[in-house]
Regions:
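Membrane-cytosol interface motif
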Residues: 139-143, 322-330, 438-439
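Active-site proximal loops enriched in glycine and acidic residues that flank catalytic Cys/His/Asp
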Residues: 355, 434-436, 448
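Transmembrane alpha-helical segments and their membrane-interface loop/helix boundaries
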Residues: 1-114, 159-417, 462-602
Length: 602
């Protein structure tokens, strides 16, 4: 039986001397510093506690591939009752179904590494902290540059392995291939190459544009590029169930589409290694294209990065030029708002405070871009349908997809705005509201402060919804182009914007951008579960109600009355919540409320 280590007395511990920290070189310390910046920055975690959150994300990155490989076991090994209609002694799944299974793993690696690289977009190049702090230290510029390059490489390779090394643990048992060595070799080569190409392409794109356009012009299009990248990546993944039905037609016909879609290149590597010389000729061509594209992309990233690095440092030293943020186009709109929604001075001040903060702080715009990219990709995946007829792939527009797109646009627009508004880390303006109105303020003042944010969200979501409906109307099927259908869709869209704004902001008790960091780490799994539970319900509403509302004017008026009643009920509930908040004793900036609440929630 092993004995526990003997406890040393204080004198014995003192005799051991101080604990010696490991000796690390300057280069090693710099690499660790840059990696720490990747895991702790204001975009990922405004409260400065991103390490635990990103560790959860890193673990979750490998779960989808692992779970899909696990769920494929009964497909290749049928048992009683599953899959339905297949006997126990059935042959392996059809060839093209197996190809689609391989294609998913390639596609997932491509999308996962692309999203991670886009999310860390701004951290790959120096910022003001690096220029005005690190460059003043006795550190060679070359060593500083190489340390950042090494940190980028470690970051990308780490996530590349994390996203793809769990699935191979299950694949041999799930697929039960005739040649295990070929399967694992082809799988690892294809998924690693796909992920590496995606990350290298994003880095090369950023390096080339920054080198060619300079920092000032690149900053103007940076958010647009991030949004488009997120949209394309998420859309490709969401379209996989639709795209999988067209994969055989694309590959058998030798369509040129597959040569313009990078995931197909690495599917070619997968199938060529797995099948050997017996593989279809198109796989060899796709594999060659993938290998050449990967080498060229990495070379471009390596050549453009030093130039972009130098241009970024030079621009940071020189400083950005000033520009006028006033908009002459917005003046008439502001006058109309001041005469209608923003008559109260407090509400008007908070409304413009929100507008100016969004223009000034890039972090909040990044949140909106990420949410907008995800929402747009879900809209496209919902609207598009691919069908194969006589070996030809046809693209169709789904009427139910157009109806669901209304709810998708409203949900992701308002959810993104709420995420930005309640995000902590930019509380410089909170002191002014506390001094002028008190902390907490009077009920009427508090309602004016909070209603301004809801008006801003409602106005923004309404404009986005109007633009989305106009674009959808152009491509909508004939059944959705009549005036009755348009009126019903406008009613449902307006009602969703109004009620979702009420629902998302019902527990918001602080002025936008002035909230405090949460004292407890939020449960990421519970947050995701809330979205997965609430989001399908929101999508179901326009799909299920549009035909009923369109049936007659009586149904239209009933729907209008139901929306108004729900809005009034949510407004009353919100006012009651704010009244309870205003009745609480005021706290100083860093004072804890534990002695008064004993940590209880109510």
């Amino acid at each position: 039986m092993m004995s526990e280590p003997e406890a040393l007395s204080l004198s014995a511990q003192a005799a051991l001397g101080a604990v010696q920290a490991p000796q690390r070189s300057q280069f090693s310390l710099l690499v660790r510093h840059f990696l720490e910046r990747f895991f702790n920055h204001e975009t990922a975690s405004p409260d400065g506690d991103a390490k635990s959150r990103l560790i959860l994300i890193a673990v979750a990155t490998g779960i989808p591939g692992f779970m899909v490989a696990l769920y494929l076991f009964p497909v290749y090994h049928p048992f009683i009752g599953w899959p339905p209609g297949r006997p126990l002694n059935a042959d392996p799944p059809p060839y093209w179904l197996q190809v689609n299974h391989h294609f998913f793993f390639v596609l997932y690696s491509f999308v996962a590494l692309g999203i991670i690289t886009v999310f860390e977009w701004d951290l790959f190049f120096p910022d003001l902290l690096d220029v005005f702090v690190l460059t003043t230290l006795p550190i060679q510029d070359r060593r500083l540059f190489l340390a950042r390059v090494a940190a980028i490489g470690i970051f990308i390779v780490g996530f590349l392995l994390d996203a793809n090394l769990l699935a191979p643990l299950v694949i041999p048992a799930s697929f039960d291939p005739p040649n295990l060595t070929r399967l694992l070799t082809g799988h690892l080569l294809a998924v690693l190459a796909a992920g590496l190409f995606s990350a290298a392409f994003i880095l090369a794109l950023q390096g080339v544009l920054l080198s060619a356009l300079g920092e000032a012009l690149f900053r103007r299009i940076s958010l647009l590029l991030q949004g488009l990248s997120i949209t394309v990546l998420v859309m490709v993944l969401l379209l996989f169930p639709v795209l999988s039905g067209a994969v055989p037609a694309f590959l058998q016909s030798g369509s040129r589409i597959v040569f313009y879609c990078p995931p197909f290149w690495f599917l070619g590597i997968y199938q060529r290694v797995l099948e050997g010389p017996a593989a279809l000729p198109i796989y060899s061509r796709l594999a060659q294209t993938g290998c050449v594209a990967l080498a060229v992309t990495i070379a471009i990233a390596m050549l453009s990065y030093p130039i972009a690095y130098l241009r970024r440092v030079r621009q940071l030293v020189v400083g950005p030029g000033t520009h006028d943020t006033r908009s002459w186009v917005a003046r008439p709109a502001h006058g109309l708002l001041h005469a209608t929604l923003l008559r109260d001075p407090v509400r008007r001040a908070v409304f413009h405070f929100i507008s100016q903060t969004l223009l000034r702080v890039q972090r909040y715009r990044i949140y909106l871009v990420l949410y907008g990219g995800v929402g747009l990709s879900v809209v496209v995946a919902s609207v598009l349908r691919l069908s194969v007829e006589q070996g030809q792939v046809r693209v169709e527009i789904s009427a139910d997809g157009v109806r669901a797109a209304i709810a998708i646009v409203a949900f992701w627009t308002i959810a993104g705005l709420r995420m930005a508004f309640v995000s902590p880390g930019n509380r410089q303006g909170s002191w002014a509201f506390g001094i002028v109105h008190g902390r907490p303020p009077q009920l009427d003042t508090a309602m004016h402060l909070l209603q301004a944010a809801k008006h801003w969200v409602l106005l923004c979501s309404g404009l986005v919804m109007l633009a989305a409906m106009t674009a959808l109307w152009v491509f909508a099927p004939p059944e959705l182009r009549g005036w009755r259908a348009a009126a019903c869709m406008l009613l449902i869209a307006g009602g969703l914007c109004l009620l979702l704004t009420d629902f998302f902001f019902i527990n918001v008790k602080t002025v936008a951008f002035t909230g405090e960091p949460a004292r407890e780490q939020p449960n990421l799994a519970l947050t995701v579960l809330k979205y997965f539970t609430f989001f399908p319900i929101v999508i179901w509403i326009p799909v299920a109600s549009e035909h009923w509302v369109q049936a007659g004017i009586r149904h239209f008026l009933i729907a209008l009355g139901a929306i108004a009643a729900a809005h009034l009920a949510l407004e009353m509930l919100h006012r009651r919540i704010i009244q309870e908040h205003c009745n609480m004793p005021g706290l100083e900036d860093d004072e804890d409320d534990f002695p008064m609440k004993l940590g209880l929630r109510y």
